[in-house]
Amino acid sequence: MKKTVLLTSATILLGVGFQAINASAAETFPKEYNTEGTITFEAGDNEITPPVDPENPDPTDPVDPIDPPGPGTGGALSIDYGSKFKFGTQKISTADQTYYAAPDEMKDGSKKPTYVQVTDKRGTLAGWKLTLSQPEQFKTATGEELVGAQLTFTKAEAASMVDEKYKPTEVSSTISLTPGVNNNLAMNAKKETGVGTWVYRFGSNEATNKEAVQLFVPGKSVKLAQQYSTKLVWALEDT
């Protein structure tokens, strides 16, 4: 009787072993276990974003203009750069004349379309607005006005390496300035647009920029053999 009990127990144990093997063979692979990767961004600091190439506005490949007006404004929402508009030296004429601004020259010898650059690194998609004003008429150093002179910006467009869906919602293709009239709209990036670096360029390359920025001077205006200059104010608002 004792042997029979032991034999029966051994048989039961062997059966359990077979069940364990069968259960293991029934497992499903591959097995999955989820982990997580995280990163948190905050608004950019006051570091100035360098000027980008207006033809190919890649922030990782900046350009170096020969004659920048000054450093950008800095900040998380900033105007990084704006071209000077140079109309050269011209002969005095008693006929109406239109003069054209030269392209923006770079230290590597290349010439680019004139432009203004805005960067939004706030991370809020809140939007912004860029306007242009000419507080006063062209004047000499002694205050003599170039009466009737008018600046017109044409072929204007927005360009960026950022996805097209973030393009500013309103882009003025032409701006005609009247001295003393403020806030002529250049670009309006409404909510959910305008993120990253954007250029407002006058022509897409040097060739199309040649006659894009115009200065009309009436023949009847008195012209002294001196340099005339005017201030242009680009204003960036948080909307």
Language-model segments: residues:
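Bacterial N-terminal signal peptides
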Residues: 9-17
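Signature of Gram-negative chaperone-usher
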Residues: 4-7, 21-239
